[in-house]
Amino acid sequence: RLLDTRFKLGMFDSPEKSKWGHLGKKDVDSKEHRALAREVAQKSIVLLKNKDGLLPLKDKFKKILVMGPVAANVNALLGNYNGLNSHLVTMLEGIIGKTEDKADISIDYVMGVGMYGESKQRGWTLGQAENADVVVACFGLDNAMEGEEGESVETIKGDRETIELPKWQLDYLQAAKERGTPIVLVLTGGSAIAFPREIADAILMVWYQGEEGGNAVADVIFGDAIPEGHLPVTFPKSTEDLPDFADYSMKNRTYRYIEK
């Protein structure tokens, strides 16, 4: 199959015969390709919850707090085996870009908690959630936390042993929720993540969004794009709900897509 694909791509043809031979550096990272990357990212986003029509935010809220270890993290835009990119747009950058021409809307940002462990800054950063009109909480996994081989040397990295959202992230989210401000949870990852649905008022599963991810997420949050995605995998409530890994009977499991 690998060789078949290479033949179809014309990799064994002479440049003058290959229909791809005319492509060069000018065709890499073009405006058209970035626009396509943004569109694909938009359409992959899954809306899991939207209590009281919190989304889209549009211009309903004037003080927006962006928080979480994923918000300014380019690694949370990329899956494993990714290539190099000239420019990656983080979620924080996308949200700022969406509102920078609106003088009456302010954006604050706190990481709040670490990607791979507890943060000592947790206490004082939570106060900002209380003072905001709405919180956009960017949490989840990055390509190292679901990595393979070399990344698995560090204990936090490599294959996941549980499907739960990391405890330190969940604890911080819970503390932020107790402040009473509406929360839009933006989750990154490439597999099922278990978490309590009541942790946020609106929930978007955005996966690994790619180079235009921050812009695509901001488009959906502010209503310039519709989250059209569907879950390709089941999200169990907890690791305990999963059958034993050595059980190959496939009872109560199916390859079929179920609407409800």
Name each model feature, range by range.
Residues 4, 23, 27, 35-260:
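C-terminal non-catalytic regions of proteins with extracellular/luminal or membrane-system context
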Residues 1-16:
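Long, well-ordered, tryptophan-enriched scaffold segments
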Residues 19-21:
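Short, conserved phosphate-binding/catalytic loop or strand-edge motifs used
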